[in-house]
Amino acid sequence: MEYAFASTRLKLRSASLPLNRLRALSESATASEIMDVLHRFGLKDTSSSLQDADMVLRGAFKREAEGVLRMVKTSKFLALFLRKFEILEISDFLTNFNESKLAVKVMRTSELLSLEHSADLKSIIAQINRRFGFNLNQNMAIGEIEDQILSQYLLKLSLISPTSIKPIIEKERKLIALPHSTDFEHFLGEHKGSWFYKVLNVDKNLIDLKMAVYLQHISKIYAVRDPIGPGAIVSYMYYLDLNYKFMKSLYFSVKTRIRLNLRAIWEI
């Protein structure tokens, strides 16, 4: 099935979470804010005016575009993973784009990796297994493959311990929130004083354990120190390729309440 997907739109979608946060804070972003966001994410301004840039930004949040974002979230994560390790070029996901109409046609999830110009799904899985020593089943659904890649990759990086934090990734990809459990309290106690501990303690019911582990990972890699604000949290997350689901869990699942809490933390 032919589908359209533009490089620029891919970048806009990658940036859509912080853009969404910006729009939540201000329903009518100024032209300068729009240009700043476009340049911040490395988007070359191909338009001739700020008005055109405004149209590009706002077009990314049309109802139909948001529907497309939900449809492609599975391929988005897998595409980032494959690109990161040069298993599959991201360009294989991009074809025939009609910018004026925001024409984006997306295959059903089961067909997302049936690419015309690349290896088939079984070949891709075989490459991943050889490269990382994984044991991915070629007959699994794409969503299951995605979960297995993420959980096995995190375990390889020693980011999670299945004996002390249970379980980070569920098969159905449900959020894990353990506000009253021994494991969760122990986890908080081990990391008291860190900036993500402050995030968790604002409202523990709003944050899942995956997010805590991910924040811990970022703080280690970039030696992040207190205080740090929501803008910086977003920026650091976007330097990591394997970020899509974690960002989704933070900025979509808990939405406005957590954004406001993050803003309050910035002022601590």
Segment roles from a protein language model:
Residues 1-268:
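N-terminal domain-start signal
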